[in-house]
């Protein structure tokens, strides 16, 4: 799939890089003004033509076009919502995982940033990095449940779909929250949490009967552990003395489930 290996490309609402996208939630992005633009799939204009993926890469392969940055996370404007349907934001996901398991994490994160609830009113900014592992792929995978297109999903000996897209074995989420009206230069103003989620089709959940939010706690880990698993230095713009402290541990009771 297309990535910038030695550079990044950034717009007002998203960043393209080798490893991750960094959706930023604040007083602007945490509001909901528009609804999802279903099936508004589009090529990302920031990508060089040689790196672009279009819809033909995502059809008749048994996998969903799974959002990394969720559509509902970019509902403050029509343009921002359309950007979530760029193929640079899509990852091949098993149908039951996308619609019944991963969606619960999307809904959980979304609930944290809404200003009309107790948790969202405490934090003025929440930073989220999401992605799939490209060094750990679903190799020689043979699905037992057909995808939304009616095709049985499968990958080759390298972990690629029939159309040539890599299928992550794990998905990850890193979250950093900053308390409103608190100094930006002290560690107690921040809290972090990570999630490490195995990509499987046997969780037994559906869109109508998704994972209970409380059960997402089983996937929670510290940012330090997530960095060890992914090789990514999350939230590296924090001063080291803050980063070292807030990434070393997490407290489940600090978050609203």
Where are these regions (language model features)?
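A short, polar/proline- and glycine-enriched secondary-structure boundary/capping micro-motif
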Residues: 30-36, 204-209
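Domain-level detector of nuclease and nuclease-like folds
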Residues: 49-257
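Active-site-proximal segment of RNA-dependent polymerases
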Residues: 34-52
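Residue-level detector of intrinsically disordered, flexible termini
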Residues: 8, 26, 39-41, 153
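Right-handed beta-helix
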Residues: 1-8
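Active-site acidic/histidine clusters and adjacent loop/turn architecture
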Residues: 21-25, 31-39
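Short, small-residue-biased leader/transition segments that mark boundaries at the very start
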Residues: 9-22
């Amino acid at each position: 799939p297309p990535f910038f290996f030695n550079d990044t490309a950034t717009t007002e609402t998203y960043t393209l890089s080798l490893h991750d996208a960094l959706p930023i939630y604040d007083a602007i992005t945490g509001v909901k003004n528009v609804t999802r633009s279903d099936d508004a799939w589009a090529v990302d204009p920031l990508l060089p033509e040689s790196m672009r993926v279009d819809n033909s890469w995502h059809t008749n392969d048994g996998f969903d076009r799974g959002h990394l940055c969720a559509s509902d996370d970019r509902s403050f404007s029509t343009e921002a919502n359309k950007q979530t349907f760029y193929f640079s934001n899509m990852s091949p996901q098993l149908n039951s995982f996308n619609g019944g398991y991963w969606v619960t994490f999307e809904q959980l994160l979304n609930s944290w940033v809404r200003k009309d609830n107790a948790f969202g009113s405490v934090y003025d900014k929440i930073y989220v990095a999401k992605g799939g592992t490209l060094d750990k792929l679903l190799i020689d995978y043979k699905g037992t449940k057909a995808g939304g297109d009616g095709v049985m999903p499968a990958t080759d000996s390298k972990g690629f779909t029939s159309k040539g897209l890599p299928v992550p074995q794990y998905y990850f989420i890193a979250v950093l929250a900053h308390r409103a009206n608190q100094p930006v230069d002290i560690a107690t103003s921040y809290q972090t949490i990570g999630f490490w989620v195995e990509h499987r089709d046997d969780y037994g959940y559906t869109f109508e009967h998704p994972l209970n939010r409380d059960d997402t706690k089983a996937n929670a880990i510290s940012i330090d552990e997530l960095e060890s698993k992914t090789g990514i230095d999350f939230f590296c713009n924090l001063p080291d003395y803050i980063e070292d402290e807030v990434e070393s541990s997490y407290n489940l009771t600090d978050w609203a489930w």
